[in-house]
Amino acid sequence: MEPVQYSYEDFARLPTTVFWIMGYDMLGVPKTRSRRILYWIYRFLCLASHGVCVGVMVFRMVEAKTIDNVSLIMRYATLVTYIINSDTKFATVLQRSAIQSLNSKLAELYPKTTLDRIYHRVNDHYWTKSFVYLVIIYIGSSIMVVIGPIITSIIAYFTHNVFTYMHCYPYFLYDPEKDPVWIYISIYALEWLHSTQMVISNIGADIWLLYFQVQINLHFRGIIRSLADHKPSVKHDQEDRKFIAKIVDKQVHLVSLQNDLNGIFGKSLLLSLLTTAAVICTVAVYTLIQGPTLEGFTYVIFIGTSVMQVYLVCYYGQQVLDLSGEVAHAVYNHDFHDASIAYKRYLLIIIIRAQQPVELNAMGYLSISLDTFKQLMSVSYRVITMLMQMIQ
C-alpha cells in the first residue's frame, strides 16, 4: 500500500505552528473573533515584555554598577548578541505580505495529483523526524535556560530549607528580604514572555526559510528527473516541444521564486549568521567559565542546536546551488539525438540559464553554502580560543 503523499498544507504546518507559540499568525488563518482577540493580547504581552526586558538590560549596561565580573560580562554579551539575532529575524518575518505572496506562488506550483506527488517524491522532502526533534530540543533547551533557576531554587528549598528566589536574567534585581513575592512572580512572567519572543523569532524565521528553500529544491529535482526520463523524437516533435517549453518556463519561474526568497530573507541573513556565530562564542565561553552546572548543561545543548540551525541553512543553500547546476548536466546526459532542431534550441536555452547558478544569498553577494558554514565555525573557534586566553 502506497503511503499518503503529503500536501502543501502539511509542509506549512510546522513553521505555522512554531510561530503560533508566540501568538503570531503568519498565513492569516481565519479565526473566531474571541480567538483573534486572545492572540492579539498574547502577542502584545510578548512584545511588551520583550521591550521592557531590553530596556532594563540597556539601563543596567549604561549604569554599569552591577556588571562587576567576567562571568557577568560574558552573560551580557550573550544576551545582547542573542537579542540582535532574534530581533533581526523577527523584523524579517514582519514582511508578512511578501511571505504570503511567495507561499501562494509555491502552493500553485506544488504537485496536485497523487501520481505527480509520487513522481516528485514529495514525501522525501518532508520534515524528517530528526529535524522536528532538533526544533523541539532547541525550544526545550531554551525553556530550561529560563526555568532552570527556579528549579534550582526549589531543589535548594527541599535540600536546605531555603528558597533562593533565583531567576534567569541578571538585569532584574530581586531582594527577598525587601521585595514582596509578587515582584518575583512578575519578573519571572516578564522573563518567560521575553524569552518566548526571542526563541520563537530565532528558530521560527529559519524554519520558514528552510520551508521555502525545500520547496524550490523539490522542483529543481523534478526538472532533473523529467529530463532524465524523457526521450524525444522527431516523430512526436509537437509533444516534445510542449514538454521542453514547460521545463524552460519552470526553470525561469524557479529562478524568480529564489530571487523572491532572497529578497525576503537575504537582507538579514548575513547579520543573522554573524550574530548566531557571536552567540555561539559568548555562550561557549560563559559555559566554560561557569563549569558543570544545570545552567551549563542546558547551554551546551543550546550551543549544539544553534550550530545545527546554522548548518541546515547552509546545507539547503548548498543544495539549491548544486541542483541548479545539475540541470545543465541533466541536459548534457539527455537522450536528445533523435530530437528536432527546435527541441535542441530549447535545450540550449536551459544550458545557458543553468550556467548562472541559483543560490541562497545574503544581501545579494554572499552565497550561503557549506563553505560558509565551515568558515563561520572556523572563525567561531578562533574567537572562543582568543576570549579564553584573554580571560585566563
From Swiss-Prot:
Expressed in olfactory sensory neurons in the antenna. It comes from Drosophila melanogaster (Fruit fly). InterPro entries: 7tm6_olfct_rcpt. The atypical heteromeric and topological design of the odorant receptors appears to be an insect-specific solution for odor recognition, making the OR/Orco complex an attractive target for the development of highly selective insect repellents to disrupt olfactory-mediated host-seeking behaviors of insect disease vectors. Odor-evoked OR currents are independent of known G-protein-coupled second messenger pathways. It is found in: Cell membrane. Residues 1-36, 91-130, 201-268, 317-363 are cytoplasmic. Odorant receptor which mediates acceptance or avoidance behavior, depending on its substrates. The odorant receptor repertoire encodes a large collection of odor stimuli that vary widely in identity, intensity, and duration. May form a complex with Orco to form odorant-sensing units, providing sensitive and prolonged odorant signaling and calcium permeability. GO terms for cellular component: dendrite membrane; plasma membrane. The keyword Transmembrane helix applies. Keywords: Cell membrane, Glycoprotein, Membrane, Olfaction, Receptor, Sensory transduction, Transducer, Transmembrane, Transmembrane helix. Interacts with Orco. Complexes exist early in the endomembrane system in olfactory sensory neurons (OSNs), coupling these complexes to the conserved ciliary trafficking pathway. Its main location: membrane. The chain crosses the membrane at residues 37-57, 70-90, 131-151, 180-200, 269-289, 296-316, 364-384. This is Odorant receptor 85f. It is a multi-pass membrane protein. The gene is Or85f.
